[in-house]
């Protein structure tokens, strides 16, 4: 009920209090506003106790890894390995699973994994000069994928097959079975699926998809980027046929996670490489002046060339520790409360349309559009007038957007032709509201009220802004660039 404070809201009060920036204010053309952060699926927020732990406990002993002789080197090496083991336990990795960290999120690790699998090694990708049809890998994806789990596969040797959407645009295992039947002669079959949509928060039955892949001689990889901060991850469920052969996620999306690296965990039997993806320091047992050398046997060490991102992985492990402290069951209950209230409030606003409106069992992601108002104008008005931080656009899920917004082939090509000519004004999109268990009921009521007022007054308020067709952004007429000058000042260590 509006204004009602639940027991789970009380439970998350301390976690909220420790979130860096929870009371941060900033200046807008309409006065000073307090940040109400609703962009969690894009990135998490820093957490005070983790920042203090990084600076006060780990910081004084920071030194390069790859040694267990010096005090700093040995402590950081041990801390790095302990962090890796902690992450593995969290996802119920098995003794034959290995962990590799790379880059800043899931995009980096899935591309690295594709290279490790040898899927980007042919000079003639996606042509008959490289592989026969039966030898060419086939990768099955769904219509809800983030671009990272879609476009990255297009740049491999594999044929990429998008499964037909099920009822209400859900992911239907029957569609996978039909595709597997069609490609039954392929020797190398991969299913790479999102655990959850980053647009609508709708879950996929990924263990059922894993079962089908394994029953048909394939492999199953799962992208947990959107859902990892909120749900249990189990690579090895009770039924072995539903195991996950590889998982990817972005710890920066966790509370306390910004600044961490991308994480993947996979079955070591998939590793066939004779050389690491990035040869370098720490990847060899020995070299000599005659061009001879030997790479280390450990896959995790071999694929961790150079100085590893040990602080990034330590931070990821601490963010996971925080998630475990909050408890996934508590998170689920609070998410359900917030989603239910968001649906009640938003569906009552005339002209506001929620995407995937028939599915309320979802992660805390509610995307919508408002008749007659550009999605980026709505985002700008929420920020300038109310302090509410959301995201507008296609959320790096443009293909899903075609289905959600019923964009036809001809319409799509008219839009893409305009985009190719530098005009983004017809690019479809929506506003994404990300809910988080630390969010209060009062904050959510503010969001609902703000959207109601924007629906009523947005057209008039738009007169304060100019629109740039090339960037698809709105700028307030009184914006004099002071924000950029403020950011520059942040880099002055003497102030």
Stretches with model-predicted labels:
Residues 1-495:
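Pyridoxal 5′-phosphate
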């Amino acid at each position: 009920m509006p204004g009602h404070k639940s027991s789970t809201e009380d439970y998350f009060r301390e976690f909220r209090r420790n979130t860096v920036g929870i009371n941060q204010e900033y200046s807008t053309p309409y006065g000073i506003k307090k940040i109400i952060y609703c962009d969690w699926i894009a990135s998490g927020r820093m957490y005070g106790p983790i920042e203090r732990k990084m600076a006060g406990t780990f910081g004084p002993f920071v030194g390069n890894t790859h040694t267990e002789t010096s005090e700093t080197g040995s402590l950081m090496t041990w801390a790095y390995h302990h962090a890796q083991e902690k992450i593995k336990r969290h996802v119920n990795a098995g003794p034959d699973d290995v962990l590799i960290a790379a880059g800043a999120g899931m995009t980096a690790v899935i591309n690295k994994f594709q290279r490790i699998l040898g899927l980007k090694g042919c000079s003639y990708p996606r042509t008959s000069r490289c592989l026969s049809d039966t030898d060419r890998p086939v990768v099955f994806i769904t219509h809800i994928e983030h671009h990272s789990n879609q476009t990255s596969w297009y740049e491999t040797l594999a044929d990429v097959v998008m499964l037909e959407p099920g009822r209400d645009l859900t992911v239907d295992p029957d569609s996978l079975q039909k595709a597997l039947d069609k490609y039954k002669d392929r020797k190398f079959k991969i299913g790479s699926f999102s655990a959850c949509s980053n647009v609508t928060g709708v879950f996929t039955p990924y263990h059922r998809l894993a079962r089908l892949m394994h029953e048909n001689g394939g492999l199953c990889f799962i992208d947990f980027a959107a859902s990892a901060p909120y749900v249990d991850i189990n690579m090895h469920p009770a039924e072995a046929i539903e195991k996950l052969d590889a998982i990817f996620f972005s710890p920066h999306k966790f509370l306390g996670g910004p600044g961490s690296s991308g994480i993947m965990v996979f079955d070591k039997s998939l590793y066939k490489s004779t050389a690491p993806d990035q040869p370098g320091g720490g990847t060899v047992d020995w070299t000599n002046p005659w061009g001879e050398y030997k790479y280390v046997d450990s896959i995790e060490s071999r694929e961790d060339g150079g100085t590893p991102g040990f602080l990034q992985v330590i931070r990821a492990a601490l963010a996971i520790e925080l998630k475990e402290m909050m408890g996934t069951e508590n998170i689920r209950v609070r998410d359900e409360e917030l989603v239910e209230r968001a649906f009640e409030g938003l569906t009552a606003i005339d002209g506001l349309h929620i995407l995937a409106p028939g599915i309320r069992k979802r992660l805390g992601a509610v995307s919508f559009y408002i008749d007659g108002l550009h999605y980026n104008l709505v985002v700008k008005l929420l920020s300038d007038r109310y302090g509410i931080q959301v995201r507008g656009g296609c959320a790096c899920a443009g293909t899903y957007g075609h289905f959600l917004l019923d964009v036809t082939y001809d319409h799509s090509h008219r839009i893409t032709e305009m985009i190719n000519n530098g005009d983004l004004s017809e690019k479809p999109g929506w506003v994404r509201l990300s809910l988080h268990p630390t969010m209060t009921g009062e904050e959510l009521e503010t969001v609902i009220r703000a959207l109601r007022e924007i629906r009523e007054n947005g057209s008039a308020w738009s007169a304060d802004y100019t629109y740039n067709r090339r960037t698809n952004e709105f700028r307030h007429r009184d914006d004099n660039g002071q924000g950029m000058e403020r950011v520059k000042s942040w880099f002055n260590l003497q102030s």
